[in-house]
A protein has these predicted regions:
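Positively charged, low-complexity intrinsically disordered regions
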Residues: 8-9, 86, 185
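A short local structural element in Rossmann-fold oxidoreductases
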Residues: 6, 46, 158
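Charged helix-capping and loop-helix junction motifs
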Residues: 16-19, 187
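Active-site phosphate-binding/coordination module
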Residues: 18-118
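Conserved acidic, metal-coordinating active-site core of Asp-based
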Residues: 97-195
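Residue-level signal for pocket-adjacent positions within structured domains
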Residues: 11, 61, 70, 75, ...
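Asp-based phosphoryl-transfer active-site loop
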Residues: 1-12
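Glycine- and other small-residue-rich loops at beta-strand/loop junctions that grip anionic moieties
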Residues: 13, 37, 77, 182-185
Length: 195
């Protein structure tokens, strides 16, 4: 059994009721396997994971990775290619109000031009970001990047990205009106659960 943890603007993940926790423990004690699939990055989900009884690896970063909290290691990742940094920086250069968060595998979130949406996202996820001057300075490997701006600006940004020949290498989608995510082609929660 796998459940999704949806993202709700401005809302942290609510606590799990004792009734649900007891039901999950019963399910697992009787041979069931349970895990979570979330769009949240590992640093943003880690503290919540301690509240969720799981006996199977969790999907994080909208399907960009499969993580085993028992062994504290990634079992599978769909890393972005190194070219994403230059491509993403080109997008930032064309859209001056946009910020981008870059999710490194080592529990670090870097942010280029953090804006009000970056700060709101930090508040909701309780995961801090490390500001960097450009996306080119963010170390690899990356699991996902996420552009943050007003919805209207992100629509134009998404349209620009979709016209680039390299866009075929990625999944580009809104996880919220002010958040446009980029993961490797084929990365999704469902696809990672199926693995």
């Amino acid at each position: 059994l796998n459940t999704e943890i949806p993202r709700r603007t401005g809302c942290p993940i609510p606590p799990i009721s004792r009734r649900n926790t007891d039901a999950l423990r019963y399910f697992m004690a009787n041979g069931g396997r349970f895990a979570v699939a979330t769009g949240r990055a590992l640093p943003a989900f880690r503290m919540f994971a301690e509240q969720v009884p799981m006996n199977a690896p969790a999907v994080v970063c909208n399907g960009g990775a499969l993580y085993d909290f028992k062994t504290e290691r990634y079992l599978e990742t769909m890393e972005l290619p190194e070219t994403i940094r230059g491509q993403g920086q080109d997008v930032l250069d064309r859209f001056p109000t946009a910020a981008v968060e870059a999710y490194h595998m080592d529990n670090v979130i870097h942010a280029v031009r953090p804006n009000e949406y970056t700060r709101q996202h930090e508040h909701v996820t309780h995961a801090g970001v490390q500001p960097v001057p450009t996306l080119l300075e963010v170390p690899m490997p990356l699991i996902k990047i996420m552009f943050e701006d007003d919805h209207e600006h992100l629509l134009a940004l998404r349209d620009y990205v979709s016209r680039q020949p390299w866009s075929a290498d990625y999944e580009v989608f809104f996880s919220d009106r002010t958040l446009l995510e980029v993961t490797r082609k084929g990365a999704s929660k469902g696809a990672m659960v199926a693995r």
